[in-house]
């Protein structure tokens, strides 16, 4: 299992494309308070998110949805989206992307962590610039104007 700090969050790759004949990827994401990725869209993958703990606000297109434990949401490809931990403690998500491939972007954009107990690293300006620069190779656009 690969564990990566990406966008200030900790992502554990539970199943990667090599495990699923490239059909899907399953990841566990730990978001500190205020954590979550910048607004972006995928040209290749659809995503689902199941909130395992905490409170997360999802922005999918023009729709804003606040979810707590057990909440589930779909983020289709080609639709801008992002999410924020809007609770007071850590939030945990189970994320599925299909087809597989987004995990290779996370590995390229993030930094390896030793295990699932490690805390995510700070998301620096250099990390943001790198993420924006490499995202197109993976069919992803990082949207620089954040509404929320």
Annotated model-derived regions:
Residues 26-32, 41-60, 96-99:
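Short, conserved beta-strand element in jelly-roll/cupin
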Residues 1-24, 118-148:
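A short, N-terminal "cap"/entry segment at the start of jelly-roll beta-barrel domains
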Residues 10, 48, 55-57, 64, ...:
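Structural motif
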Residues 62-80:
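Short acidic-glycine-tyrosine-enriched beta hairpin
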Residues 20, 57, 77-103:
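Ligand-binding loop in jelly-roll beta-barrel domains
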Residues 15-16, 38-43, 84-86:
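Short histidine-centered beta-strand/loop micro-motifs
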Residues 10-11, 34, 76-79:
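Short acidic (Asp/Glu) patches
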Residues 89-133:
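A contiguous, mid-protein "functional segment" used to position or interact
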